[in-house]
Amino acid sequence: MEKMENIKNNKINEIKDIENLRLTSGKIINKNVHQIGIIALGSYLENHGTVLPIDTDIKIASYIALNVAIQTGAKFLGCVLPSTEYEYVKHGIHNTPNEVVEYIDFLVEQGKKIGINKFLIINCHGGNTLINELIEELPYKSDIKLKIKNITSTHASTEELSVGYVIGIADKSKLKEHNPKDYPEIAMIGLTEARKNNKYIDNEAKIAEKKGITINEDLGNKILKNAINECILEVELLLNNK
């Protein structure tokens, strides 16, 4: 009983300590934005043809997440290291959905210790959508609010190359070698099992086959601007308990 009382008192003191901080300082949209944490989710180990690095997804997610944190004042909590993928998408090195959720759970628990009770996960890897149902089953859903914003595009195709170019991770000099005949993961054109099992993947592959793959800086800027603005809106909704 005494131990429980001490824990309760420590929690009260922690809250008071946070309240003593200058929560209105700096460029923020609202002092309550300090209760919101931004987490980047992507993938670290996937081939992306010749133009983009193997950790493209997490770098794009981190870029968006950090910019949202800077523009709103929300806290950037870092990256989820594991990622997952559909069984029929045979490329990259991934983890189980449960391992991804366990890492998110760790970040949430640590975030709660610094006064965060609302979390926005910005995901830039399609395979990670497998965690959606598991997230809903987390036991602390009554204590916190957690939202996932999925921002994905055709794998290693024009949109992703263009975004990668804008943030500085694409090597444009390698575009001529960026060929799906040599690198089947590009637009998943050569991933037969994935195309057979997922009509959306197959449709995206067909579009890339028809239109070709290039780098468009204007397109990259537009995609990034829209993604950041959409995530800022999510932060504003969290501020309004929506």
Swiss-Prot record:
The keyword Ribonucleoprotein belongs to this UniProt entry's keyword annotation: no
Keywords: Hydrolase, Iron, Metal-binding, Zinc
CC cofactor note: Requires one Fe(2+) ion for activity.
Record GO biological process: F420-0 metabolic process; riboflavin biosynthetic process
Pathway: Cofactor biosynthesis; coenzyme F420 biosynthesis; Cofactor biosynthesis; riboflavin biosynthesis
Coiled-coil portions: none
Class of the enzyme per the UniProt entry, highest EC level: hydrolase
One MF term in the entry's GO annotations: ferrous iron binding
Reactions it catalyzes: 2-amino-5-formylamino-6-(5-phospho-D-ribosylamino)pyrimidin-4(3H)-one + H2O = 2,5-diamino-6-(1-D-ribosylamino)pyrimidin-4(3H)-one 5'-phosphate + formate + H(+)
Chain positions recorded as Fe cation 2 binding sites: H48, D57
Catalytic activity, EC: 3.5.1.102
Binding site for Fe cation 1: E46, D57, H125
Cofactor(s) for this UniProt protein: Fe(2+); Zn(2+)
Oligomeric and partner information: Homodimer.
Record-linked NCBIfam families: ArfB_arch_rifla
Family of this protein: Belongs to the creatininase superfamily. FAPy deformylase family.
Functional description taken from the UniProt entry: Catalyzes the hydrolysis of the formamide of 2-amino-5-formylamino-6-ribosylamino-4(3H)-pyrimidinone 5'-monophosphate (FAPy) to form 2,5-diamino-6-ribosylamino-4(3H)-pyrimidinone 5'-phosphate (APy).
HAMAP family registered for this protein in UniProt: FAPy_deform (MF_02116)
Protein name: 2-amino-5-formylamino-6-ribosylaminopyrimidin-4(3H)-one 5'-monophosphate deformylase
Organism, as annotated: Methanococcus aeolicus (strain ATCC BAA-1280 / DSM 17508 / OCM 812 / Nankai-3)
Lineage: Archaea, Methanobacteriati, Methanobacteriota, Methanomada group, Methanococci
Gene: arfB
